[in-house]
A protein has these predicted regions:
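N-terminal secretory signal peptides that target proteins for export/translocation
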Residues: 1-4
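Bacterial N-terminal signal peptides
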Residues: 7-17
Length: 442
């Protein structure tokens, strides 16, 4: 049988029609242009390119040319038109449709970030919509005061005049002191947490062979931890030790940054989209883009998927508290209080919204975080520095988690359906879905 005829049959089967094949090839060329534009923006914004593992000559080209921001914007506008002209036809595979929508929205966010680099100032909600495809709900102080009252009643009171005058955040800090991981035990606790997160993830998700990450301990950062994805299924995870690290952060960070969070998310995208399909746009991660809400939302929700509350408490009591030299009998009490404090997570969004809109200054933003988020003063000041650097990115953690949780639950991934919950979660991790595509209409 003629080899050329066989090859033609294979190509026809893959493309279905000549037009479909041409469209796919054209989208690949457009995706390459997108990657190069992201790398070009990175020459003007050091935080913009969060990860890149495509051809190194493209990075070198971006560094050598250092294109003007106005040129980048003009090319991005043209690329958007080219992408719009190549919308997939009716009946196209869902992933192909998602790819087209993803590339469109990522380019729109790139243009918004470029406009900001050129001096455009957006209000908080305008910025989050432009960059992350969503707007966070607004809350008032009254929304948090009821929870603060519950926390006030839950925290112990000590005798003495000074104790009676202590503020709620001071009492919360005092309560938490016994749950700090001693610095000399930090590494062993994190390794134990990582092992637990990884083993639970591997029970449900087949990871690419050779995947791994290393942990580094750093200081003088505005964030508490960071995953630097290197490509080839490898990550570097940095943990900031500027401030005391509490025992609950071990699982939170191990899951969020590692398994089944950022490390798994990036590895699955690399395997299923970049390598298996050749979609080069997934070789680069633009931080200020809709992809980040998916990344942060799945990373935060992944903690609950890997460790539902009863299982987490058992693991803490049996493994992590002893590894940290803490009293396991106090674990349940600690997590009861944390469950209340978690209801204050949107207080951070309000501080950021008011601060970035120019309604309050940095000191007032830290005051708000102390009063309504129960941040210690050093941690509140660190968070304001994070707002200075990353701005409306803060919504991706809490709103992102809630949106991912609702999306997974709407597809039957409820806590009582653990195996299916993992399946829905893995599908989300492996697909180019947009934040607006997560919205559940009741």
């Amino acid at each position: 049988m003629n080899a050329d005829w066989i090859a033609a049959c294979v190509i026809a089967a893959m493309c279905a029609t000549a037009a479909g094949c041409a469209r796919a090839e054209t989208m690949d060329r457009l995706a390459e242009r997108y990657v190069k534009l992201v790398l070009a923006v990175g020459q003007h914004d050091p935080d913009y390119v969060d990860a890149y593992y495509g051809p190194q000559e493209w990075r070198k080209e971006a560094q050598a040319s250092k294109r003007a921001v106005s040129d980048i914007d003009r090319d991005a506008a043209d690329l958007l038109k080219q992408v719009a002209a190549r919308a997939p036809g009716e009946g196209a595979e869902e992933l192909v449709q998602l790819r087209h929508a993803y590339l469109t929205r990522q380019l729109e966010a790139l243009r918004a970030r470029v406009a900001m680099l050129q001096g455009t100032r957006l209000r908080f909600d305008e910025e989050s919509k432009a960059l992350y495809d969503v707007v966070a709900p607004t809350h008032t102080a009254a929304d948090f005061e009821k929870v603060l009252g519950e926390i006030d009643r839950a925290l112990p009171r000590r005798s003495g005049s000074q104790a009676s005058e202590a503020s709620l955040v001071e009492r919360y800090d005092e309560f938490r002191k016994e749950f700090v991981i001693p610095p000399d035990r930090l590494d062993r606790v994190f390794k134990a947490a990582i092992d637990g997160c990884r083993s639970r993830t591997l029970e449900h998700i087949q990871l690419p062979p050779g995947e791994s990450f290393t942990v580094e301990y750093v200081t003088k950062k505005s964030w508490s931890a960071y995953n630097w994805y290197q490509g080839n299924y490898r990550s570097i995870i940095q943990v900031n030790t500027d401030l005391p690290i509490y025992i609950d952060r071990a699982i939170d960070l191990a899951c969020h940054e590692g398994y089944p969070g950022h490390h798994v998310y990036n590895a699955l995208l690399e395997k299923h989209l970049m390598r298996d399909r050749g979609w080069q746009e997934f070789s680069v991660y633009a931080l200020f883009s809709p992809q980040s809400l998916i990344a942060e939302g799945t990373a935060n929700f992944g903690v609950d998927v890997a460790f539902p509350r009863p299982e987490r408490l058992a693991f803490e009591e049996k493994v992590l508290f002893p590894a940290a030299g803490l009293d396991p009998s106090r674990a349940s009490r600690y997590y009861d209080v944390l469950a209340l404090v978690e209801q204050l997570v949107y207080a951070g969004n309000e501080a950021a919204r008011r601060y970035l809109n120019g309604e309050i200054d940095a000191q007032a933003a830290a005051d708000w975080l102390e009063k309504y988020g129960l941040y210690s003063r050093p941690r509140a000041e660190q968070r304001v520095r994070f707002m200075d650097q990353y701005r409306s990115y803060v919504i991706n953690y809490n709103l992102g988690k809630d949106m991912v949780a609702a999306y997974v639950a709407a597809r039957g991934g409820t806590p009582d359906q653990s195996s299916w919950r993992w399946d829905v979660f893995e599908d989300l991790l492996s697909s180019p879905r947009l934040p607006s595509g997560l919205i559940v209409n009741h």
